[in-house]
Amino acid sequence: RQGIRPLDRVVLQLPNTPEFVHWYLALVRIGAIPVLALRAHRHTEVRHFIRASGAVAYVVPDVAHHFDYRPMATQMQGEFAGLRVFVVGEAGAGQTAHAALLQGQPDDEVTREIRAAEAAVDPAEVATMLLSGGTTSLSKLIPRTHEDYVLNARLCGRAGGFDAQTVFLVILPLGHNYNLASPGILGAFYVGGTVVLAPSTDTAEIFRLVQQERVTVIA
């Protein structure tokens, strides 16, 4: 309903929250391409990602770890005509709140469009754009295809002993390949395992989650 189509690039800059998972899976399901930014990236990096990928949308939290992402998103809107901004939390002027997207049910026409988009996804097409380490300059975009990334997650999960009893605790950023698909959350989901998202790197919180959720794998 928001006009995001197959092969559209969307810069995704969210912390380790359920909304990251919702956005990532929704985008790849219809053949749109998430460009994964890390929470520490600021104007210079985000501008580069939008320009290099040709992104049509940018997804951010309102405030995370004492930083308000909305003014930065507003600046990007001023620099890139037509850029849509979606905010998890309270949206700023000219931005769309994530919660507003969840109101009501999609009508029959939208449902048909979604199903058609899902059916048309080419396994050999780009599914995700990861970032290089950026040790010598701004990070480069690394395209990963649907078939490549599913195989990557499946084989890494097999090597890691993932199965339906796996309870995977995510601590490192989901925007990294490691915790996304090596084997990451995709490896856990592939075998029907459980994913637990740590809200911080606080040691006491981590140990509490390990005990409470009976965690079997940490990354």
Over which residues does each language-model region extend?
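Conserved AMP-binding/adenylate-forming core of the ANL superfamily
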Residues: 1-25, 42-47, 99-106, 144-147
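Structural core segment of the AMP-binding/adenylate-forming
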Residues: 2, 30-103
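A short helix-loop-beta submotif of the ANL/AMP-binding
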Residues: 9, 15-35, 39-43, 51-58, ...
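Conserved S/T- and glycine-rich ATP-binding loop of Class I adenylate-forming
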Residues: 10, 27, 126, 131-135, ...
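Conserved AMP-binding/adenylation subdomain of ANL enzymes
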Residues: 31, 150-167, 177-217
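Short hydrophobic/charged patches on amphipathic alpha-helices used for structural packing
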Residues: 46-47, 118, 204-207
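Adenylate-forming
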Residues: 60-72, 172, 201-202, 215-219
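Conserved pre-ATP/AMP-binding loop-to-beta segment of ANL
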Residues: 87, 92-93, 105-131, 138, ...
